[in-house]
Amino acid sequence: MRTIYLQLVGLVLIGLMGFAPGAVAAEEAGFKPIFDGKTLNGWKAPDMSHWSVEEGAITGRSTQEHPVKSNQFLVWQLGELDDFELKLKYRISGTSSANSGVQVRSRVDKDGHVAGYQADIDRAGQWAGALYDERGRGMLATRGQKTIIDSDGKTTYTAIGDPKTLMAIINKDGWNDYHITALGNGITLEINGKVTAVVVDHDQKNRDRSGVLALQLHAGPPMAVQFKDIQLKRLGMCQKKKVVMVAGPRSHGYGAHEHNAGWLLLAKMLNENMSGIQAAVYTNGWPRDPTAFDNADAVAIFCDGGGGHVVMRHLEETDKLAKKGVGIACFHYGVEVPKGEPGNYLLDWIGGYFETFWSVNPHWEAEFKKLPKHPITRGVKPFSMNDEWYYHMRFVEDMKNVTPILTAIPPDSTRRRGNDAHGGNPHVRARMGMPEHVAWAYERPDGGRGFGFTGGHWHWSWASNDFRKLVLNSLVWITGAEVPPDGIPSKTPSLDELEANQDYPKPDNWDRERIQQMIEQWNH
């Protein structure tokens, strides 16, 4: 991108979408490779037989012997796109009907077909440089066109270049540079340094602000398309705050420590109910996406803890984020790391942590009779919940800048068991009958925000309206966004929704009726 492109596209985006001048990235830095040039690691298609790496390029190929009868898509597996710039080189060969494209902010349908925004590529020159909505609204902007789509779907077209002149800059037989920028509701396409299409999409029903990246191999006569030097740069979210939700690997059994299912459920609720929030989930451990945190306003970690905590190999990386003001939150076992350097980091990030031989992790019924006045408690009524509520956390000295959010008095029986790293210890026994904090908010001296929450053992607890709302509120608060006066709205998830995405198969003796009765009791 650079001077010419920034001046043109910057003016287009600012004029059409009301962005501040600083919203468009002004530096080349920040692009990271997402294809290693050697393997298809991190890329996957339903039928991999058409895809390979040749001459350092991802290659999609159809032949007379192995034709493509329906469009094929190679999907990047390591993350999704929201606001971004993508740069790559492409080359296409075959007959004049050879066609391809780059899918962005798209979805994968059940049949493996990828639907959504497509930066078009073809050999004949009819579609190259256009923006198409695959399996959707069809052509959005032809080459040389700027399209504004109103909220009711009506379109206004303006010429931004001559299609033939723009086609003349495309190398029919050689490599071409494709540069795709998506910021807010706007998408801009550029080939070989020239803007070919601009779309500003205000159609809330049909537009997408996030989704997958995929490469297309079109059905038809034999052809080949190649992609190389694929680089991604995430942009600060336009009129949104972003929380990156890191889910740890599978852990206990069905319905417990369901990191993936829990975060996928809550992220869906945030994205559906908070237009100013973008929640992105990375499942099964620390993200392999090298750009995962580049435009994050907050990071929320739900995982097993101790020495196996997902952050243990990424302490310095996470600390750099915190020092930039990125919010940090840890949930359930995720509040525990080893004492020493890891524990000190959590004290810096969230104001407290589970320290072995100091804190304890019993299961008990916590009754939260009174809630403090805080954005995280907005719309939340006093409630009770049986959970593995860890307590007696190690907090920063004098609990400076820490606000207790959930406080209850544990049964004395939870303090008596043994003398070990997680059970009873003299420190907790000295506090018989005293209140303990099991969730807290932290306002860091650097301006960032932290949150710790020790509940979340049982996946079904997300069906408790007050339990769930408090956590949703916390995920918004740590981004720096304003929590609505009545908290984050969301519908009580159904049993089918709760059972989705779990790590383990459902046991034969699973009692759905018992869970449904608990949910009704929580929300009566």
How would you describe each model-predicted region?
Residues Q7-A20:
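Bacterial N-terminal signal peptides
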Residues V24-C238, L346, G352-Y353, V360, ...:
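Carbohydrate-interacting regions of secretory-pathway proteins
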Residues E65-H66, R91-S96, V108-K110, A124-W127, ...:
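Solvent-exposed loop/turn segments at secondary-structure junctions
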Residues C238-K240, L265, T283, T414, ...:
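Extracellular ligand-binding/catalytic regions of CAZymes and related secreted enzymes
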Residues M245-V246, S251-V337:
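Helical hinge/lid and interdomain linker segments adjacent to catalytic or ligand-binding clefts
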Residues F357-D446:
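Catalytic beta-strand/loop cores that center a nucleophilic Ser/Cys/Thr
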